Amino acid sequence: MGLKCGIIGLPNVGKSTLFNILTNSNVDALNYPFCTIKPNTSVVTVPDDRLFYLAKLAKSKKIIQSIVTFVDIAGLIKGASKGEGLGNQFLHNISEVDAILHVVRCFNDKNIINLSFDPIEDINIINNEIIQFDINLINKLKNNILNKNFYKWKYLLKICLNYLKKGKLLNFLSLNLKEKKFLQNLKLLTIKPMMIIANLSINKIKNKFFLEKINILIKKYLVCKICLKIPQKEKKLIFFKKNINLKKIIILSFKLLNLHTFYTVGIKETKSWSILKGTTALNAAKKIHSDIQKGFIRVKVIHFKDYIIYKNETQIKLAGKIRIEGKKYVILDGDIIHFLFKV
């Protein structure tokens, strides 16, 4: 699944630095606005101890991990939705991602070209721009409301418009799955799940004011605290290895995308597959190959904890822990799945 996390924020808050350390890249991360113009993209494998343990038990020759794509999007500024800076271009870049990592500077530095010292205020600047983008988009869609595809959603667009005008993000609006899917297909920005990346100073004393602000944010957002500012005497690689839990950030990004993992296990290969929570066995089959979905018969299901206890399929079968399920079975996180199908 080619799911993407977009890294956004004001200029010079650490977006490109975060992108570089997540993806082991070397894009420019300089102290002036719009250092990044075109979005940088890179793929990262998702850390998964379960996958490697299953592969070890099965003596697999090959291990294939799930992936998440990270996109480094240029800095937004106040007025971006009206075209300030290169705003419209950057906002459209956000529309192409599935989830948002919003980097916020949580330290003072007179050398940085961005004088705001309040992370909540900075978040609100970005939120206001993506809210206005969505208001503009919905107003344009109202002109197409006679289109059959939109007419039945007229009530929802009206609710969304009123919600946005109150300064609220649509990802906080209570929606059913069909409503959410419709809004996602419109590529609205505020419907996308968002995580705040709080870029703190290594100096804990200096962080006191900002930590108080972060504690306010935690009540509303998923928040990950990191330090992207390297002390002058430290070497970059050593500093990041000591101070940044990359595994945590990647796993939280995976969680933000609302994904589950299932596994196919064998001697030839053991592979993890990323699916949206709530995916049925029939739809998961298509992820492997469309022919498996077309010829779907049933699935054999083993849960991860049973594989760990009994070590191999023979013992699992003797223990009665292999379940047979049909096409409507909702796959759970950690399921080991064997698809039975006809060609």
Where are these regions (language model features)?
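Conserved Switch II/interswitch segment of TRAFAC-class P-loop GTPases
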Residues: 44-45, 74-81, 95-136, 143-148, ...
